């Protein structure tokens, strides 16, 4: 390899590594452009853990501690069968329950016509509900006033 081709090789290799790094941080950079407002009970630990999960993914999070969340869920049109412990809003979408950050990022990038995403109930192993390596299966539901579609599925995982 002569000097010129070595230089090109080093530059190209460096650019390749830089692009890998940029790709790794791209979701975080994207998330930082959006503010997530979370309505939760002041005493709920799993809601606080989900907030930490979202912050770790790069979201700017504002928390509103509210004793009775039923009026919030009704205001944001979350059907009773989709409800969980906390409700969040971001960029015109509702996020109900322990939705993984990567699904919220996908929602914001794809911008489907919907009210939002929900993980009904409180499935073990969903973000904020971690218990060791165990994960119960759960689905992330994309919902509108008339439809519900499976947006993502997370299979069961044992320790």
Model regions and ranges:
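N-terminal secretory signal peptides and thylakoid transit peptides that target proteins
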Residues: 1-20
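C-terminal segment of N-terminal export signals and the immediately downstream linker at the start
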Residues: 25-41, 49
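Short active-site oxyanion
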Residues: 35-36, 59-60, 91-94
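N-terminal targeting signals for Sec/Tat export/insertion, comprising classic cleavable signal peptides
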Residues: 39-64, 74
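Active-site-proximal beta-strand/loop segments in catalytic clefts of secreted hydrolases
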Residues: 39-41, 66-67, 98, 120-122
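Amphipathic alpha-helical interface surfaces
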Residues: 50, 68, 100-104
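Thiol-based oxidoreductase modules, predominantly thioredoxin-like and allied folds used
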Residues: 61-72, 81-82, 90
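Thiol/selenol-based redox catalytic cores and closely related redox-interacting motifs
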Residues: 75-159
């Amino acid at each position: 390899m002569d000097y010129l081709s070595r230089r090109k090789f080093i530059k190209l290799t460096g650019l390749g590594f830089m692009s890998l790094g940029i790709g790794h941080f791209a979701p975080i950079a994207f998330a930082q452009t959006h503010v997530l407002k979370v309505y939760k009970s002041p005493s709920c630990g799993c809601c606080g853990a989900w907030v930490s999960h979202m912050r770790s993914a790069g979201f700017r999070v504002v928390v509103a501690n509210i004793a009775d969340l039923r009026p919030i869920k009704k205001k944001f049109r979350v059907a009773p069968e989709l409800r969980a412990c906390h409700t969040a809003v971001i960029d015109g979408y509702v996020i109900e329950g322990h939705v993984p950050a990567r699904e919220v990022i996908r929602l914001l990038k794809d911008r489907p016509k919907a009210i939002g995403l929900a993980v009904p109930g409180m499935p073990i192993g969903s973000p904020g509900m971690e218990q060791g390596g165990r994960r119960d299966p759960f689905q992330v539901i994309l919902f509108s006033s008339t439809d519900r579609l499976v947006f993502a599925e997370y299979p069961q995982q044992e320790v």
